[in-house]
Every structure is written in C-alpha cells, then in structure tokens.
Amino acid sequence: MRYTKSEEAMKVAETLMPGGVNSPVRAFKSVDTPAIFMDHGKGSKIYDIDGNEYIDYVLSWGPLILGHRDPQVISHLHEAIDKGTSFGASTLLENKLAQLVIDRVPSIEKVRMVSSGTEATLDTLRLARGYTGRNKIVKFEGCYHGHSDSLLIKAGSGVATLGLPDSPGVPEGIAKNTITVPYNDLDALKIAFEKFGDDIAGVIVEPVAGNMGVVPPIEGFLQGLRDITTEYGALLIFDEVMTGFRVGYHCAQGYFGVTPDLTCLGKVIGGGLPVGAFGGKKEIMDHIAPLGNIYQAGTLSGNPLAMTSGYETLSQLTPETYEYFNMLGDILEDGLKRVFAKHNVPITVNRAGSMIGYFLNEGPVTNFEQANKSDLKLFAEMYREMAKEGVFLPPSQFEGTFLSTAHTKEDIEKTIQAFDTALSRIVK
C-alpha cells in the first residue's frame, strides 16, 4: 500500500501540533510506521486519504459499535443539526438518553452527562471524596481512567504503594492520594485497606481492563471488590467508559452481576461524538450541584448533537446484538488460534463481549505484568503486515480490538486469512 498523501499530511501536521496529532496513539510510534490520515468510513470499512481500504477494528477506539455512518444515526444527526448545534439550556434529547441509560445500567438511578470519559472519571472521584469525606482513591495497575492528575499514577515496588506521578506536571501531593495495586489481586487490595482504609473514598476499576490489551476479571475479583469496599464504607466505582454497552446489554456490571455505587460511561453512549457520563445511586448523585454542594458543570454537556447520536446508537442495541458479537468473536478467536499454531507463534486471546485482545505470549494474561511479556517487536511487525492486507488494527499492544454490528462473517474470515498471510511473511 502507498501512504504518500498521509506522509505529506503528517509533515505539515508536525509543524502545527505536538507530534502532529491530537492524541498520542495516533502517531503510530509503538509500531514504527507512518501515521495514517483517514478520509471516510462506511460500515465495517475505513478509507485513508491515499485511497486504501481497511476492515476497521479500531472503530474510533470503541465508540462506533454500529460501524461507520450508520444510516439511522446520520439521518437523525442531520435533523438535529438543522435545529442548532448547542443552546446552553436543556433539551428533551437529554431526557431521552438519560432515561435509556438509567433503564439499562443497573447501578444508575440518576445520571449527569459530560463531554468526555476523562471528565466523567474526574468528576466521579470528586463526588466520591465529597460524599465520603475521605481523600484516597485506589486504582489498579494498567487500568487507564483518563488523563486527570490523580489517575495518571503508576505503582511503586510495594504491594500496596502510595502513587508516584506517571507524567511530569502531576504534583506528588496529588499523587500521594492515589493507591495503586495489581489488577485481579484481592490480597493486595486487602493490604491497602488495612493500611489506609479509614481514608479511602473509593476504588475505581475497569471491570474489564481495556488499556493493557483486553484483560477480563478473574472469577470472584469484582465481587471481592464489592465486598471489601462495603466492609470499609468506601465507594465502588466502575469505569465503564470502554466496557459500557460493549460487554453486554446491561454493560459489564450486568454481565458479571456485580453492581457498583457509581459508574462512568463514554465512547458508545456518544455514538462517535464527544460524550461522557457518570451516575449512580440517587442518595449519592443528589450531592452534585445544583442539589448539593459538590460542583460540576460543562458548557457543552448534554449538547443536542451528542445526545442524538448517543440515543440513536443505544436504541438499536438489543440482547440479540451481543449474541451476534459472541458468534463473530468465536470465529475470530478460533481462527487466530488456528493460524498462529500453524506458524508456531504463541498467542493468548482474551475476550469480553465485542472486545478482543491478543497477546503474543504463552499466557495467561490476567494483569499488567503478564501483558508486558508480549512480544512487542513481533506485534509491530504484525501490525505493519496486517495494514498491507487491508486490516486496520489498534497500533498498540495495549489497546483493545473492537467489533461492530457492521462486521460480517466475511470480514472475519478475510481478517483470519490476512493474519495467515502476514505470518507467512514474518515467520521464516
């Protein structure tokens, strides 16, 4: 494939934006390949400015669960645009999407719309601290919750360690109120609560980790979080920005049967437009302004375009949608295992609903340490060869692969064949 126009566009972009991008992963640095500039998408396909066609498994990093340019979403967006883009006042569209979210997400009795997943997690932590009167938050190593200061934290050497900044610009004073423990490790969490339990406001977790690849919870982990937080009077917060409506019809919490106190949402609930949300029990949510004294606001929160796209996306999802995802996922997983075995290359495949992650190691992969054992050099080679075969995968080992309702069995079979062809060139 030729990338001449993308390479020229990137040269210009690098003079205008840091690294030429507005989000780091789009620079494609971890796979050592030129950034691709996209032109348009349709269904399961995406097309770059050089005219190359790809089967798309990035799907805008998750939001496009119906694929690109879904007719129902696009039609209603045109109607909404004709009325105006934003009013700075409430619209009926906010009621419609809020009611749909409340009906489908077990933990949410009231919801507040915001404009991004980062905003949702940031506001949720402020609410948790304000509601409990405590300062510390527990997060898990390898789980990403947006780029707010208190969540850009890495683990130290101890089992339960007060956080150190993971990025310059994050004050140590803020970092010290974040405790990081290994994902899927209840013993480590218990130690954290034994040390700091009286000052832990909440535990935030991706119920399926999606930012170290795709790493589902081991049996009993989520229920263990529920039990421990309840025992200590801390809040359990599910960050379902990625898993929300991707793992199941009632999100990950419905799929796994564990109900948190607060939930963060994003991605799918905007259908491709900037949206986030957080919600939970009425008794907690009523502490948010204007009812309570915990402040939160947003100029474009609940804007009519995002509410339209979100509602028209979620309204098309049914329990049968997830049966379809499971069918496609079964075919893809079986095909990957068969092809990699054929070429004697180790692979571990993790799945949750329409999220799929593959690691180039023997496995299992249940935490960030194990995910880091993947062969990153081989992953980069695989990415480049798959792009040549017309398959657009996430350009990072630590990002998930997504399915949409627009994907077909034919797409999956072509993808499996592309892996076979790519491996034939890589493995000598």
UniProtKB/Swiss-Prot annotation:
SUPFAM superfamilies: PLP-dependent transferases (SSF53383)
Keywords in alphabetical order: Cytoplasm, Isomerase, Porphyrin biosynthesis, Pyridoxal phosphate
Modified-residue entries (N6-(pyridoxal phosphate)lysine), positions: K267
Annotated catalysed reactions: (S)-4-amino-5-oxopentanoate = 5-aminolevulinate
Cellular localization per UniProt: Cytoplasm
Single GO biological process annotation from the record: protoporphyrinogen IX biosynthetic process
Family recorded in the similarity comment: Belongs to the class-III pyridoxal-phosphate-dependent aminotransferase family. HemL subfamily.
Protein name: Glutamate-1-semialdehyde 2,1-aminomutase 1
Species of provenance: Staphylococcus aureus (strain JH9)
